[in-house]
Amino acid sequence: MSNWKTLNANYVYKTAFGNLRKDTCELPDGQIIEEYYVNEYADWVNAIVLTKEKQIVLVKQYRYAAQDFFLEIPAGKPEEDEAYEHAILREVKEETGFISEKQPILLGEFYVNPATQTNKVVSFLIVDAHKAFDQELDPTEFIDVQLVDLNDMETMIATGEINQLFTVSAYYMSKSLLTK
C-alpha cells in the first residue's frame, strides 16, 4: 500500500480556532482528487476526574454546532508549547476548580477523524481530586460542574444522558483503573 501524494495545498481560510485547507491529491493508482478538504485543528486534552469520594467531575455546557447542552468530562486545548499533562491539570482547575496531588494517568492519544482532520485527543485519568478553587472560565465559557457517582456513569451513557463520544471513550478506557 502506498501513501497519497499532495500535489497542491492552499488555505481556504485561517482562524485562531482552526484552518481549512484545500488540497489536490494523487492516489496510489494515479487518480487525482482536485478538491480534498482538510480541517486543521489543534490537539486537545480531556480527563476522567475522579474524586476521593468516587464521584466523576463532569461539566455541562451548550454546544453550538449541535444546538444542545452536553454533559462531558473537562477538556481543552493546550497553550503554546504546553505539555499535555500540564494542559489537562490547568483545564480541570479552570473549568471545575478541582485539583489533585497525583499526576494524570495517560489513557491514550487518538486521532479524532483522520480522514478530514489533523488533530488528536489525548485522554487522561485524574484520581483523588478535590475542590480547591473557584472556576476561572474564559469569557466565552459558561460551564456548570456536576458530580456523578462512579456507579451511575454506565446507566447515564446507556440512556443517552451522556452522549458525547470522547467522554464515553475516556470513561471506558479508564474503567479498569477505576475499579482498583
Predicted regions and their residues:
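A short, amphipathic edge element
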Residues: M1-N10
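Short, solvent-exposed loop/turn elements at beta->coil junctions and helix N-caps
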Residues: N10-Y11, G108-N113
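Conserved Nudix-box catalytic region and its N-terminal flanking loop in Nudix hydrolases
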Residues: Y36, Y41, N46-R90, L137-P139
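Acidic, metal-coordinating catalytic segment for phosphate/diphosphate chemistry
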Residues: N10-N46, K52
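Active-site-adjacent beta-strand/loop module that shapes the phosphate/pyrophosphate-binding cleft
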Residues: T24-D29, N113-A132
